[in-house]
């Protein structure tokens, strides 16, 4: 839980020295550090502010028993995504050209796709941030 200063207790902050090479380097680092201790890895982007706890819980449940689950939105798939430990070796092979999306769309892999309109909304610009005030129409179609 976050305290008044915004510090999350019970969590360890990990710095990725190779951050400039892309998100795949952060996923690889997480797999290296968590492979023994964690059954699942959640990939959630900090700017996906509309994704709910219930949606994340659904992904975790759908990825149980060695599976994987990801959001489906706007005709594509992507984060948030949950990968079970069995996927860690594949995640360790990711690079800038072959990211996690390639794994999620591989027909040989079993991936549960959870419809998640909220995952399609992220904040990439000041305009995106300003549109958050009208986000209910995006999510609920009002």
Predicted regions: what is each one?
Residues 1-77, 85, 109-116, 140:
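Nucleotide and nucleotide-moiety/phosphate-recognizing core
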Residues 38, 52, 91-92, 133:
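Activation segment
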Residues 56, 87-91, 129:
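A generic structural signal for short hydrophobic patches within well-formed alpha-helices
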Residues 79-83, 121-123:
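Short glycine- and hydrophobic/aromatic-rich loop-to-beta-strand nucleating segment
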Residues 93-142:
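Conserved alpha/beta core of the MobA/IspD/sugar-nucleotide pyrophosphorylase nucleotidyltransferase superfamily
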């Amino acid at each position: 839980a976050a305290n008044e200063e915004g510090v999350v207790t019970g969590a360890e902050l990990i710095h990725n020295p190779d951050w400039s090479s892309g998100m795949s380097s952060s996923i690889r680092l997480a797999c290296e550090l968590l492979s023994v201790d964690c059954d699942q890895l959640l990939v959630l982007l900090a700017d996906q502010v509309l994704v709910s706890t219930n949606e994340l819980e659904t992904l975790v449940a759908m990825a149980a028993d060695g599976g994987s689950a990801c959001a489906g939105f706007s005709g594509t798939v992507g984060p948030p995504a949950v990968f079970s430990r069995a996927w860690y070796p594949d995640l360790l092979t990711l690079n800038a050209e072959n990211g996690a999306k390639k794994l999620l769309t591989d027909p040989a892999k079993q991936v549960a796709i959870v419809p998640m309109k909220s995952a399609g909304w992220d904040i990439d610009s000041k305009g995106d941030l300003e549109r958050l005030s009208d986000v209910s129409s995006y999510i609920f179609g009002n």
